[in-house]
Amino acid sequence: MTTKQLPSLTLVRRIKASPAKVFAALTKPELMIQWWGPDAGPTLSAEADVRPGGRFNIVFQLTNGDVHNPTGVYKDVIPEKKLVLTWEWREMPERESLVTFLLEPIDGGTELTLIHEQLPDEGTRQSHEAGWNGLLDKLVVFVGDAP
């Protein structure tokens, strides 16, 4: 019996900011609330207990007015290097997946790799890819050109 391979995605960005600054933007609620989300809509709230077993909870509003609430649990935390967390939508908790952020120092900044695994189907993978691309673009602008 073979197990079905669930869809995943991997995105990479080179950011003109230190791993410390990128990690802070991904983990500090007072920074997350300033930029988190896939489009120009606002982040309404951000909570993060950044330790293995700690939870995060983010509420953001899209420009079309839709409100989304991803939440999850931190599985692995290595400051300025790695962040692994479960990812679920408050409205669909049965669809838990796994997100990994890898931060690698490079000349001039940080290479950020985002891996989102265990997505339930191809449609979900495609929508998350679009969302993560928008979010990473916002992150690059938020932390870019800073030491």
Model-derived regions: residue spans:
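Intrinsic-disorder/low-complexity, polar/charged segments enriched in Ser/Thr/Lys/Arg/Asp/Glu/Gln
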Residues: 6-12, 19, 43, 55, ...
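Hydrophobic/aromatic beta-strand elements that line small-molecule binding cavities or substrate pockets
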Residues: 13, 46-48, 70-76, 87, ...
